[in-house]
A protein has these predicted regions:
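Domain-scale recognition of functional cores that engage charged ligands
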Residues: 1-139, 149, 153-156, 165
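A general secondary-structure signal for short beta-strands and their flanking turns/coil
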Residues: 129, 142, 180-182
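Acidic, two-metal ion nucleic-acid-processing modules in DNA metabolism proteins
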Residues: 146
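Short nucleic-acid-contacting surface segments enriched for D/E, G, S/T with interspersed K/R
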Residues: 172-183
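Conserved small/polar residues in nucleotide/adenosyl-binding loops
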Residues: 185-187
Length: 187
């Protein structure tokens, strides 16, 4: 979603007489992650701010998300080292990691790929940022949640989808969602 850009005095910013719109929401945060030089980033929005008396739970959740993320990253790096310049000796094991731990459904064409092509495909799935996200039961609050998204290569990936990204004809999917996002960690 986009918002109107404003001046320091909170009046609408205009460029050439026209209102200027800027990316907003979680999408803008994710785009900015590319500019951050860090191994691990926690994203916390105003929705997730808690009073001091509840911060211990927040710290425990962050430690859990961060630990899971670093564990996934360590395994992904191991598979990347094993396949650097050579064909995967264990493509089924790597494919299982991609599908069961990174929640990426492989395209039907994967099973017919050559060993070299499978290795390249799996390396592409591993050699990218990894995100983990905490979820809570959906109790009717507005916002996004986890959904399977069809990818151009025929696979599917589990992504956080905001309500503004859901086609009007699919709004019922959001209403039936069982979980809601609470926070994210990225490497």
């Amino acid at each position: 979603s986009d918002l109107i850009a404003v001046n320091p005095d909170n009046t609408p910013f205009r460029e050439g007489g026209r209102l200027l719109f800027r990316p907003a929401g979680h999408g803008a945060l994710i785009e900015n992650l590319n500019e951050i030089d860090a191994d691990l980033v926690f994203v916390k929005t105003v929705d997730n701010v808690v009073p001091d008396r509840l911060k211990a739970d927040t710290v425990a959740s962050k430690e859990t998300l961060g630990g899971l993320l670093l564990s996934l990253q360590e395994q992904a790096f191991e598979y990347l080292r094993e396949t650097d310049g050579r064909v995967a000796e264990n493509p089924d094991e790597i494919a299982a990691f991609v599908t069961e731990k990174l929640y990426r459904k492989l395209p039907a064409s994967f099973r017919d790929m050559t060993a070299e092509r499978k290795t390249r495909y799996l390396r592409d799935m591993l050699d990218r940022p990894i995100r983990v996200c905490g979820m809570v039961r959906n109790e009717g609050e507005p916002g996004g949640g986890p959904f399977w998204v069809s990818e151009p290569d025929g696979g599917e990936s589990l992504q956080i989808v905001e309500s503004s990204q859901i086609a009007p004809g699919q709004k019922e999917l959001m209403a039936r969602a069982t979980h809601f996002k609470i926070g994210r960690a990225h490497v």
